[in-house]
């Protein structure tokens, strides 16, 4: 299992659009094969910055999601709302205390 972290910065007037789109699709994303957890975070000092944390069984599961119609639908809306280019990392958890 690994963690996918995505940092996204949105135009101020598009934040509600992003949140509405996320809320509409979050259960579908979470129910994607291999997705074990989906969380959305908002930066405390810059409210235009959000992070998603998702836990995936395998890289193939994530790739299958990224090639799915669901991802394409979500991303086609989301990418129009960005202020800056998103950043993404796939990481392995080293410690959990």
Predicted regions and their residues:
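Short conserved AdoMet
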Residues: 30, 57, 83
């Amino acid at each position: 299992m690994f963690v996918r972290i995505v940092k996204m910065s949105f135009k101020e007037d598009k934040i509600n659009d992003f949140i509405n789109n996320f809320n509409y699709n979050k259960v579908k994303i979470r129910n994607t094969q291999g997705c074990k957890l989906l969380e959305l975070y908002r930066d405390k000092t810059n409210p235009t910055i959000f992070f998603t944390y998702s836990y995936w069984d395998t890289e193939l599961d994530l790739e299958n999601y990224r090639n799915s119609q669901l991802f394409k639908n979500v991303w086609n809306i989301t990418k129009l709302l960005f202020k800056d280019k998103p950043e993404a990392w796939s990481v392995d958890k080293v410690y959990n205390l």
